[in-house]
Amino acid sequence: MSALPFSTICRHSNTPLHLHSKSSFIGFDQRNNIWQLFVITKSSSSRAVSKLSVKNVASDKKEELKEPLTGQVAGTTNEFVPDSTAIASSIKYHAEFTTSFSPEKFDPSKAFFATAESVRDFLIINWNATYDYYERINVKHAYYMSMEYLQGRALLNAVGNLELSGPYAEALRKLGYSLEDMGNQEPDAALGNGGLGRLASCFLDSLATLNYPAWGYGLRYKYGLFKQLITNDGQEEVAEDWLEMGNPWEIQRKDVSYPVRFYGEVISGPDGSKQWIGGENISAVAYDVPIPGYKTRTTVNLRLWSTKVSTEEFDLQAFNTGDHAKAYAAMKNAEKICYVLYPGDESIEGKTLRLKQQYTLCSASLQDIIARFEKRSGRTVNWETLPDKVVVQMNDTHPTLCIPELIRILIDVKGLSWEKAWDITKRSVAYTNHTVLPEALEKWSLTLLQDLLPRHVEIIRKIDEEFIHEIISEYGTGDLNLLQEKLGKMRILENIELPDSVVELLNNTIPAVDSVEEIDVDDSDIEATNKKDEDEEDEAGEEEQEEDNDGEDLVLENKIEMTFKVDRKLPMMVRMANLCVVGGFSVNGVAEIHSEIVKEEVFNEFYELWPEKFQNKTNGVTPRRWIRFCNPDLSKIITKWIGTEDWVTDLEKLAILRKFADNEDLQLEWMESKRRNKIKVASFIKEKTGYVVSPNAMFDVQVKRIHEYKRQLLNIMGIVYRYKKMKELSAEERKQVFVPRVCIFGGKAFATYVQAKRIVKFITDVGATVNHDPEIGDLLKVVFVPDYNVSVAEMLIPGSELSQHISTAGMEASGTSNMKFAMNGCVQIGTLDGANVEIREEVGEDNFFLFGARAQEIAGLRKERAEGKFVPDPRFEEVKSYVRSGVFGTYNYDDLIGSLEGNEGYGRADYFLVGKDFPSYLECQEEVDKAYRVQKKWTRMSILNTAGSYKFSSDRTIHEYARDIWRIEPVVLP
């Protein structure tokens, strides 16, 4: 049995280190007094008895290895795991030879990197095995393309998925550390921001666990979004240098890079072919991150691109003459593409940088996909089979340029015709919509795109032109107003003249005379008229007849121009979401209510044209990270009462808990587990904020991106009302009326989103006042946890008792934090929006606190507001006045509170209906207090939330994508 083709000479322990029998084997051996790291794999299936052999670097002889503890030949048992001594040996080896730390001491940072690199050895072996096998059988792959991946820490997740938590914990104890301490040393990977990136990471975990052949593609951001600091001025942003000490999980592929071009010009060849030349050229370099599945050898790949230019671009002459900025201008210009996630786009420079990011992701990834497709195809490449081997899933509109880029590669590089390239592309690309917010349905300036990507604009214009003809074919030219309405909503290009071919078509098909009026006349009149006409025709001749025809054409052209006129005052735009729908074979929403809104409102015209394209795929989250690993206490209870740990990969088994919801023993265990988690949260809050909170209070949590539609403002306004009412009561009355609460917020506001940053400032000001009020004490605390990320979520969610998902109905596509909270037995208060609708159905209406207007009412309510018919609740007016009184400090909140007032105008008129839903929200919170006072009832609700959360596993979601969109099958390694 041959070894993997790499070995490392080292000095260390002679204890063999081996993997689970379904995986591989690593160890150390001594030949001629030289220590050697060897790697062993098994060719037989895990069910068969097998022997392991090791390749000796010096002699290439194969020798059987014996287990050091049992004396048996390695591999003669079906199941084995590495022991702690072997793992400790591996960690010490990496501490000495791999890490970039001083050799004098074995400090926590060094210990973490050595531990991570030890784990990475296992991942690389499984990664190699996975993709060697996929290459051999040439299986169809799903390629998930996303601008962000919010991975969180990888160490505990990796050792958990590999079933090595116990051995690693014991090994680290021998070395003077704990596995938990090592996990806390790891920084979160700053590759994402919110639900979009976290969903992508959950999907990769499920793809690996379920053995689906897939890759993820993204960008390797040097500084992420930003690190959030909370000061007296609110939120401040600083660069998050998560790569400062390196990333032990990534493998730089120096041999995998692709050219990416910007600007330049397009020239035509004598045969009509197009060539994009000149401009600015950079290279995208691959960094691979192996993603392990749970209890499986399958390890999928996340390939991240970093950008650079060749050293030839360094202007040494300029540097030596003192013009240092000019010397490395090209290098910095390339590198900055991957500096920051979502750079500010208020300026033209910011917009250009974002487009460069999006195109870099698309171009490098597609070149990589096609290169691998060609390699697997052998000498003869049949491009018609590309959709049978490749499916690209665009995670929102950021990767939209995949569509014109794939066409460009197929036509300009591979020599295919337009017809073939367009057909292949339409069968290879799928689109997931994540938002109904107009500002998030990306539009880009045609002028900017033309400057940056001239060849792609040609392709987009061609797609738009063909699509217009398809619309005309569908709706005809009989009603120009209807046609104009359809084109106005469906065209890819906005506020741009019709193509010449379309104008010509309309000229040839629209009748010049719209109607003919019938009148009664005598026969004698007809004869006289005919005679007169004949005489006039003889005199006028052909010249006058031509003038009449020209006049008719001019009238028709004017009519077309007036009907399909463009507004020169408005910019010409490219609608990326429309391009996704036109260029992809599938469009899916991410929750049932969201998918209905997509079909009925956002893309209704497209749905009428192509109903077969549209479907729903309700989001999910991985139960490995979000229950099994982040809440081990609860996981043990679930396993005990269900009777098996199979629920980790078959979440439907959680439903078994329903029959035990009233069991007093389970309820007691459940409450004790929750309290232990709350104590951890209280300690964490003190560490991060300095505030001391009581674990006896209800932990009420809203953690998510700060945005007006997510309505953190509604939450904090409700807290202000609660605080004001407390101040009006005596100490005894307060205790009787109010349940003690710790109100926890977390989330980042985009650096340029002024109103969201005002909300953060408001929350922190309220907290500073309430938390230092001796009259209130532990009855109410308000905490904003800074720099919210995956690791913070893993701490807060297990200890949460009430979670708030209170977006304006119809504006949240799905949400995934609501699913994580439900899995961990957290009762929810929310609107009928996004996945809330389905969560409420699954956990039971009695176990979900519902309030607020419904999605179908929102448009009418906004209209009423604009007409001045809305009458605010007196309690809402009371809170606004209280805020303006200065009780929470000297900050001027007029702009924030003013957004909730008036009937019209930008930034006014309470667009997100905080005032409308405020009374319903307060009444619902009263019901929450009542339920929490009866702990037995509350615990029952908590258990039923966990039991009803099984639908929201990303495993279920991925199975549906694989079956209905990607058409791929699981591939289990032999």
Region spans (language model):
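Intrinsic disorder/low-complexity segments in short proteins, especially the signal peptide
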Residues: 22-24
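A conserved ligand/cofactor-binding region detector
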Residues: 2-16, 20, 29, 35-974
